[in-house]
């Protein structure tokens, strides 16, 4: 260092200022230092005041965040609906919170299983067993109209079912009513107007379900007419076998009358016709003779 600087510094140290100058200098410096002192003093007061009410502000802030945060909707594990709620007063442990579904009305716990017991009571098994007894949906009534079985639908014709109606069953071997109009019934020449056939017994007459008599098989008779209609031969050419043909014709008439009127009252008419047929050949000879007219 230079000697001049050392001397100046030493002189400043030796030249001591008076007390008045020192006080004045301190008074001039105090207004500048007071704000810093106040600031330092007020900082602990502010922290103290904040520390006293800090717990309350933190609590209110957390409450506001809890209220502002919406409750999370938990899906129901049964019906997968979000219409659920958290059970505040029905929780047995906080580790497994309990929820309630308003849709299917079931409780379940988070991490647990779903309860099958609904709100208000009994299980579903008891309800299922009691509902068909209380209100049967499909009551079974007895069938008042039993079906009428035909001969083709009956598996065993020998067994008779008492539950069926009392109508007789049509036999398969009987012919249809239209088959009665055969060549025997109406001849091709239009002369024979009745239905010839064999004599029917009252025991052999079968009645259908409609009440009409059904006739057994008819045997074709070889003699459609008792005499020849062809004029190529003579009128009296077949007089030899006239009694036999008349007998066959009368039998056919009796059979036809028996078919048309199957009653016992018609036996008298058949007997009268038979008496006339057993006469001698004079009746037929007189009928077929050219002179005509003879005694009965």
Swiss-Prot record:
Residues 45-62 have a biased composition (Low complexity). Zn(2+) binds at residues 76, 79, 101, 104. It is found in: Nucleus. Residues 41-69, 115-146 are annotated as: Disordered. Keywords: DNA-binding, Germination, Metal-binding, Nucleus, Transcription, Transcription regulation, Zinc, Zinc-finger. One of its GO terms (cellular component) is nucleus. Expressed in the phloem of the mother plant, including in roots, stem, leaves and flowers, but not present in the seed and embryo. In maturing siliques, found all through the funiculus connecting the placenta to the ovule, but not in the ovule. InterPro entries: Dof (IPR045174), Znf_Dof (IPR003851). It comes from the Eukaryota. A zinc finger (Dof-type) spans 74-128. Residues 129-138 have a biased composition (Polar residues). The keyword Chloroplast does not apply. GO terms for molecular function: DNA binding; DNA-binding transcription factor activity; zinc ion binding. Transcription factor specifically involved in the maternal control of seed germination. Regulates transcription by binding to a 5'-AA[AG]G-3' consensus core sequence. May ensure the inactivity of a component that would be activated to trigger germination as a consequence of red light perception. The regulatory role of DOF3.7/DAG1 appears to be opposite to that of DOF2.5/DAG2. Both zinc finger proteins may act on a maternal switch that controls seed germination, possibly by regulating the same gene(s). This is Dof zinc finger protein DOF3.7. It comes from Arabidopsis thaliana.
